[in-house]
Amino acid sequence: MLKIQPARERRAGGKKLALALAGGGPLGAFYELGALHALAEAIEGRELTEFDVYVGVSSGSLLAGALANGIDTTAIGSSFIHDEATIPFSPDTLLQPALSEYLGRMARLPQSLAALGRQFMREPLQGWPGVVGSLSNVVPTALFDNRPLERYLHEVFSSPGHSDEFDRLRSRLYLVATNLNTGESVAFGDARHSHVPISRAAIASAALPGLYPAVKIDGEHYVDGALIRTVHASLALEAGADLLICVNPLVPYDASGVRGKRRRNLAEEGLPAIMGQSLRALIHSRMHVGMASYGARFPGADVLLLEPDRHDERLFFANVFRYTGRNRLVEHAYQRTRRDLLSQADQLSRALGRHGLTLNRQRLRDRRRTFATAGEERAARVRRTARRLDHALHRLEALLAQGRPRA
């Protein structure tokens, strides 16, 4: 669904563009990839890799870091979906057991048992609650290791033409994490934290407690940035954004039933479905409170919000760890976003036009387009441009050679 919050005031110029990407785990990242690809081909006048400000939270930090580095959605798709990139991505990267965490916690067991024994001697009738409390520091804090993801991101961002340093980017990039010991949000990429590698900041922003361990940076431990706020879009607006596009992949699933379909009872779907729905409800309600305040706080900015439909069963129950699941989810998000953009084309065109952008309606109406074919078309345009540039360089070299004095 597309929600448009037009500016209450008009500012001169008005061409500073920003993109804010919320989190949502692997599922959210693949949804955002499809939605962003639809945006990239529909909006003309500026590439998504040419925006002025990027904000990433949780899994959104991975995509924000890539776009700020000039890596477009076609290249991201080649890596994440088709395994065709120079540095391909495997979902196994996200599921490596946190062995060092397990071993480190086990090493504490003798000391904890000794402390428990001393406590039992003092209070022999304390019961099981006291035992469990005494051994809590032995329980691993995470299931999976986020260091393989950090190594992958560092390799990608350090490749030729890119950078793993905030200060070397053309645009401003903010990746938001939560300080575990203070409960405060930290925006890596601001003046105080721009020395941190982008790859390190990204895994800190995406360190969901229980799944991934907290990330230590400058003596502090950081976890998922969505614990405090969902999108942190105000960072982009405070940086002077005139047009802000937000993508939020997590909305509560409405299981009340779509016409012609049997109602699904989430209570029967197991713990992951119940926890997922609870998290979505919390994140979504909190985000809309923040979005509602932007009109008064930043009256000169147009704000666009893209979200999935609440009845989208395919998105809620998708399995992103299977190749077909990833491919279908990205394609599904791509087509749904194209539909949403076209359904509000008139209002969207006016909002984009205020910032020197246009909406390609013909491309949105083309039902033959898919995520894959759109990517191939975009790659073909890049190749044609590269060939023209190569031809121009050869001609320039020939002209320079003709002008050189002979020995």
Label for each model-derived stretch:
Residues 1-57, 62-407:
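Patatin-like phospholipase
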